[in-house]
Design a protein with these regions (language model features):
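Two-component/phosphorelay signaling modules centered on CheY-like receiver
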Residues: 13-31
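Acidic catalytic/metal-coordinating carboxylates
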Residues: 35-38, 60-64
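Short amphipathic alpha-helix used as the core "switch/output" element in two-component signaling
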Residues: 41, 63-74
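Active-site beta3 strand of CheY-like receiver
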Residues: 46-52
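Receiver (REC) domain active-site loop signature in two-component systems and cognate sites
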Residues: 57
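C-terminal output helix
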Residues: 88, 106-119, 123, 127-129
């Protein structure tokens, strides 16, 4: 069976490399971007199975990219990965169409599990965000 194709965007190049490296063991990372506009263009071009987006990116933020993708019927599941832990922000991401939300501090423990859940259509939010 083919490995799921994933796209990753984060405005921090070092964290972006770390994410791509972490995910490469189980997914094919087809492309990466450091801003929201480039992310949108590359997602439309490569048509990945999953998308991981930072929340705070230049040009378009993760919620704006998610909202834009959600307008398409063929949109892949989007997982927001952010340092932002405010429950209102988590809810805004969900309302924009995000399938899941993972805190960056929990990436090592939760991201792969979250992505597998998103592929199966199951929502996931970092347990520490549920209060």
């Amino acid at each position: 069976m083919a490995r799921p194709r994933i796209f990753v965007a984060d405005d921090n190049p070092a964290f972006l490399r770390e994410l791509a490296s972490l995910l490469a063991a189980e997914f094919d990372v087809v492309a990466t971007a450091t801003d929201g506009r480039s992310a949108l263009d590359l997602i439309r071009r490569y048509k990945p199975d999953l998308v991981v987006l930072d929340l705070a990116m230049p040009v378009l933020n993760g919620i704006e990219v998610t909202r834009e993708l959600a307008m398409s019927s063929s949109s892949p599941p989007v997982v927001i990965c952010s340092v932002e832990t405010d429950p209102e922000v988590v809810e805004a991401a969900r309302k924009a169409g995000a399938a899941a939300y993972v805190f960056k501090i929990r990436v090592q423990k939760e991201l792969v599990l979250t992505l597998k859940s998103a592929l199966q259509g199951k929502p996931f939010v970092s347990p520490s965000s549920i209060q």
